[in-house]
């Protein structure tokens, strides 16, 4: 069902006044952590994009700031008690934290290609991983291919990977979605975060329909 070498830079006093707490360039993107009032956000900055990837409300840490994140939780209407969850894309770690807090005995694997994002999530957003809430520094396609070989299945798969511009191209192909389908359990649910305003939206919708049939949009 669908529903590196790291180069860190010092933060100047001027940037501190603008609320920038951390800035570094990883192998994949430029990462900024900035704070406005009680809102702590991670931002990936590229030539064509300068949008927040993850935000945490320091006055209410368990509140999901973004509407899409709150909507993602509606996956539990279709599978109320998932035992294993796969999340592609870590950001500040708000989604794995939310599912972990809500579900007893759940095991969550979060795959993040950029080790710098993992480091920032732990240092600034206080994300913690353990045996039941793992974070794996790996390309999602490689991880899923290995999961197929090991016959690993997930009751809920969430595709939430962004590179600061849009979804990485190799995670938008029919071939990738067919691989994702193979790691879904019999009653498994797939949730994908896409932009309705993207010029690729119709292409994405057609690709998902080719693989999964009808879906909720």
Language-model regions: role of each:
Residues 57-61:
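Short glycine-enriched, charge-decorated loop/helix-capping segments at active-site entrances
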Residues 202-217:
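Conserved Class I S-adenosyl-L-methionine
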Residues 4-42:
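N-terminal auxiliary segments of SAM/dcSAM-dependent transferases
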Residues 35, 63-191, 195, 199-201, ...:
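The AdoMet/dcAdoMet-binding core of the Class I SAM-like
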């Amino acid at each position: 069902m669908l529903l590196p070498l790291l180069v860190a830079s010092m933060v100047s006093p001027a940037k501190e006044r603008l609320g920038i707490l951390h800035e570094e360039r990883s192998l994949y993107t430029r990462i900024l952590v900035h704070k406005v009032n009680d809102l702590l956000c991670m931002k990936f900055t590229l030539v064509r994009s300068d949008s927040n990837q993850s935000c945490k409300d320091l006055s209410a840490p368990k509140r999901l700031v973004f509407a899409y994140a709150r909507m993602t939780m509606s996956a539990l209407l279709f599978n109320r008690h998932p035992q294993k969850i796969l999340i592609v894309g870590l950001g500040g770690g708000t989604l794995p934290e939310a599912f972990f807090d809500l579900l007893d005995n759940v095991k969550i694997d979060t795959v993040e290609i950029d080790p710098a994002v993992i480091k920032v999530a732990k240092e600034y957003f206080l994300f913690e991983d353990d045996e039941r809430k793992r974070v794996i520094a790996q390309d999602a396609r490689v991880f899923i291919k290995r999961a197929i070989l090991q016959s690993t299945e997930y009751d809920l798969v969430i595709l939430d990977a962004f590179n600061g511009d849009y979804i990485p191209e190799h995670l938008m192909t029919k071939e990738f979605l067919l691989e994702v389908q193979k790691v879904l359990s019999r009653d498994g649910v797939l949730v994908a975060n896409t932009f309705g305003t993207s010029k690729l939206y119709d292409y994405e919708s057609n690709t998902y329909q080719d693989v999964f049939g009808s879906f909720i949009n």
